[in-house]
Each structure stands twice: as structure tokens, then as C-alpha cells.
Amino acid sequence: MGETLGDPPVDPEHGAFADALPMSTSQEITMVDTEMPFWPTNFGISSVDLSVMDDHSHSFDIKPFTTVDFSSISAPHYEDIPFTRADPMVADYKYDLKLQEYQSAIKVEPASPPYYSEKTQLYNRPHEEPSNSLMAIECRVCGDKASGFHYGVHACEGCKGFFRRTIRLKLIYDRCDLNCRIHKKSRNKCQYCRFQKCLAVGMSHNAIRFGRMPQAEKEKLLAEISSDIDQLNPESADLRALAKHLYDSYIKSFPLTKAKARAILTGKTTDKSPFVIYDMNSLMMGEDKIKFKHITPLQEQSKEVAIRIFQGCQFRSVEAVQEITEYAKNIPGFINLDLNDQVTLLKYGVHEIIYTMLASLMNKDGVLISEGQGFMTREFLKSLRKPFGDFMEPKFEFAVKFNALELDDSDLAIFIAVIILSGDRPGLLNVKPIEDIQDNLLQALELQLKLNHPESSQLFAKVLQKMTDLRQIVTEHVQLLHVIKKTETDMSLHPLLQEIYKDLY
């Protein structure tokens, strides 16, 4: 990208981001109008005004989400958690899959964990972690640690096996009228009372369930834990209110949530299946079948497919930046930070969040585009000429590993807030208030993951490691943009993206 990629004129003190941020006084900052090929610019404090982008050369509405490096966590409580960059997957195979294979591939993944429930959001004040006994689910029969949901109740392996043997072998025990107390140490002393306790708590051979714990049962259990935690720590109710606030803001800011995307990818939606784009012919058909927000101008339709797709990615990136900015303004304490620090946090954080949320739209075979109307295959994107064919592959590699963590939207709402409030960004003026906010968010995220994923004891550390991976992906993305700038002299980058990428890694 030659001379057309020069930096656009912006406010020298704050830049284009400042126009989208609230002011602490009545003073307003407006961005100088910039004329660039392909896109007019208008980034106001209000929600995205799509009408001003109608002339954008947009072919496919892929969410090109980006990311960066998380070398340290600002809160001292978390500094000793090791971060490692996962080895990238190698996928160097020829593109020879057919349409039918990709249509079936859309449904290869299990559905994402269900929608957010307020009952699942349980938090503690910093450094006031609840006892381990509250975190473990107890066997309803003897009080030992439950291994899962067996015969209709949470039970340990011992009581599960005892009940199964009794039912299958039709065992009859000598009657006991002492109503013996059944606990971990005494459970083997009186088999009659133990079996009666199994029946009393609801164990039944007809209640065998396969798969994960039902959401209703999970919420009931978490509500019981919530009550116990609130009794020990009354302030946890305030943090749960914070979690609900973040989730509500997340839902309002991002139209296509992970839950909606996974429903489309797994075929669990009443809407029609997305149109699959897997080669040049299906690409041309898709332009007729998919309702894109922006029609490609006639003068741009003759451009090479790789360039048109890349420009479509740019448009979606700009739209995503505005969505993330709106979300950031709803994080408690963010708008009270120095305006320059707000701009810096967004500059370095938006692409990390973009790639985090892009993972929700991906499976190992492709990515949803145009709000779920289309599905563009991974192999088709990789088949584009270099350097364009190299852009999406690192994002797919990250997405496959990140999706394996099975975070849901309520987890992601806190996770992306943690990304934004990173106190180690270059050029911050006042780090202390940023670290204070992030420390609170980290505590919230840790407890959220413990309660929402009780079977994954190391999930918090794994999630933090993904923040390191995200920064590496952004670094690689910026390097590819430098290559395009040198080789594609007839292309231009959107002025807002130019400002974000300027001096970024």
C-alpha cells in the first residue's frame, strides 16, 4: 500500500479514538474529516452509523478480529502464573474438499455452553477466596466429593457403584430401624440405611442421564453455593451485580454472540443454514444469495477476489472497533480514566478482543460471515494468493484451541474487560487506577470460571495464557500488513485502522 496508506490527519493530541469516547467535561473532541478511497469516516460517540459506510468496497462481511501480547498481569496476585506461547498447528494440505463436505462440517462441533444466568455469576472481593469446601460438589448420600451426576443426583463413585450393584443384582439388605447416619467414614457399616438414603435423596435407575449436567440443575446447584458464599461474604452480591452489568453490556454491544454463533454452526437454530462459500463459483453465487450490509461499488467489483475479501475484512474490523468502544465505556471506572489512557487501552486492546470474538464464529473448517448468513471455508481462504492467504490461518489455529476451553458469553464478557484494562500497555500516563480495575476484574474472572466450570481447575491459568497468544497473533498480523503495504500499492487501509496500527508492535 503506497502513498494511499499515509497517516490520516487526526487530532494531534487524542486521535480518532477520542471522538468515540465520553469527555469528563463539557468539552468535545471531533475528528477532522478525512477523505480516503473506499470508505468515508465518521466515528462518533453514538452507535455505528452504517449509512456513512454505504460506499465501502465490501464483498464479504468477515469479522477480521485481531490480537496482541500479554507478557505480564498487572495485579501482583497473579504475576507468578506462567505464560507460554502454544506451538502453532501446521496445516499444509491441498484444497480439495467439496461443498457437501463443508455443509456437513458446519455441524461438527458441540453446542456452546448455554446463555448467561445471573445465578452463575458469583464473585469474591480480592484476596477473599471462598473455602475449597464450597467449591466442591458433595455427594448427596455420604457427603464425599461427588464425581458427577449419577442416577439423578450428584454422587461419589462409591455411592454410585453401591446403588448400581444393589439395583442390578436386586440385593435385599437386612432391615435396620436405627436410621443410621450415612457419611464418608460410616457409609459401609449399614447397607440398608445407605440404600434408603440413596432413595431418599432421589437416586433412581430411571433417572440415568447421559452427557453434561442439565442447565436447570446446574443453576439450582450454583444458587445453593451462591447462598453459602453470600453468608460468608455479603459483598459478593455487589460483584455479582457487576458481572450481570458486564454481561448485559456485552449483549447490547455485540449482536452475534457466541451462543447464537454456535447454534448456527451446530445446526441448532430455526433459521436456514448459512450459504457455504468454498471456491470461486460459490463465491459468485454467494454475492447473489447473501444480503450484505454494503453493496460493492461497480468500480470495485472488477478488483481481484483476494483484495475484495481483504477490504471486506477491513470494514468489519472498523465496525467491531466501534462495538468494542461502546462496550469499554460501560466497564465501571473506564470513563473516569485519563482520556489519553482510554485511547491507549483501546488502541492496544481492540484487535485482541476482535480475534477473541472471531473464535466464536469459527470451527476447524471455516468461519461464519455476514452475521451468520454465510460460511466461508478455511481452505478457500488459505487458497488465496499470498500474502492474503496467510492472514486467517493463525486465527483459525488460535480459535480451535481457544474454543476447546468452552467459555460461554458470560465468561467472555469478563475476559474481554480484563483485556481492555491491561496496565502494561506502552505509553500509559496513570497506571495505578487501571491496575486497580483490572485486579477486580481478574478476581471476578477467576471465581466465575471456578463456578461455571467446576470440573476445570486450571481453566483460569489457561485463559490467561491465551492472552499471551493473542498478542503474538496481533504482532504477526501487523507484520503481514507491512508486507501488503509494500506489495499492494493500489490498496488503501481504512484511516481508523491506520491510526490503530501506527507504532503498534
From Swiss-Prot:
DNA-binding region: 136-210
Biological process per Gene Ontology, one example term: BMP signaling pathway
Record PTM: Phosphorylated by MAPK. The phosphorylation inhibits PPAR gamma activity.
Alphabetical list of CDD domains matching this protein: NR_DBD_Ppar, NR_LBD_PPAR
Record localization: Nucleus; Cytoplasm
Domain NR LBD: from-to ranges: 238-503
Keyword terms, alphabetized: Activator, Biological rhythms, Cytoplasm, DNA-binding, Glycoprotein, Isopeptide bond, Metal-binding, Nucleus, Phosphoprotein, Receptor, Transcription, Transcription regulation, Ubl conjugation, Zinc, Zinc-finger
Residues carrying covalently attached carbohydrate according to the record: 84
9aaTAD, short sequence motif: residues: 495-503
Annotated region (Interaction with FAM120B), positions in chain: 205-280
Regulation: PDPK1 activates its transcriptional activity independently of its kinase activity.
InterPro entries noted in UniProt: 1Cnucl_rcpt, NHR-like_dom_sf, Nucl_hrmn_rcpt_lig-bd, Nuclear_hormone_rcpt_NR1, Nuclear_hrmn_rcpt, PPAR-gamma, PPARgamma_N, Znf_hrmn_rcpt
Tissue distribution of the protein: Highest expression in adipose tissue.
Crosslink site: Glycyl lysine isopeptide (Lys-Gly) (interchain with G-Cter in ubiquitin): 252
Residue positions where Phosphoserine is found in the record: 112
GO molecular function, one term: STAT family protein binding
Effect of residue 112 to A: Increases adipogenic activity
Pfam families recorded: Hormone_recep, PPARgamma_N, zf-C4
Zinc finger motifs (NR C4-type), residue ranges: 139-159, 176-198
SMART domains attached to this UniProt entry: HOLI, ZnF_C4
GO cellular component, one term: RNA polymerase II transcription regulator complex
Family the UniProt entry places it in: Belongs to the nuclear hormone receptor family. NR1 subfamily.
Subunit structure: Interacts with FOXO1 (acetylated form). Heterodimer with other nuclear receptors, such as RXRA. The heterodimer with the retinoic acid receptor RXRA is called adipocyte-specific transcription factor ARF6. Interacts with NCOA6 coactivator, leading to a strong increase in transcription of target genes. Interacts with coactivator PPARBP, leading to a mild increase in transcription of target genes. Interacts with NOCA7 in a ligand-inducible manner. Interacts with NCOA1 and NCOA2 LXXLL motifs. Interacts with ASXL1, ASXL2, DNTTIP2, FAM120B, MAP2K1/MEK1, NR0B2, PDPK1, PRDM16, PRMT2 and TGFB1I1.
Domain writeup: The 9aaTAD motif is a transactivation domain present in a large number of yeast and animal transcription factors.
Stated role: Nuclear receptor that binds peroxisome proliferators such as hypolipidemic drugs and fatty acids. Once activated by a ligand, the nuclear receptor binds to DNA specific PPAR response elements (PPRE) and modulates the transcription of its target genes, such as acyl-CoA oxidase. It therefore controls the peroxisomal beta-oxidation pathway of fatty acids. Key regulator of adipocyte differentiation and glucose homeostasis. ARF6 acts as a key regulator of the tissue-specific adipocyte P2 (aP2) enhancer.
Protein name in UniProt: Peroxisome proliferator-activated receptor gamma
Species per Swiss-Prot/TrEMBL record: Rattus norvegicus
Taxonomy of the source species: Eukaryota, Metazoa, Chordata, Craniata, Vertebrata
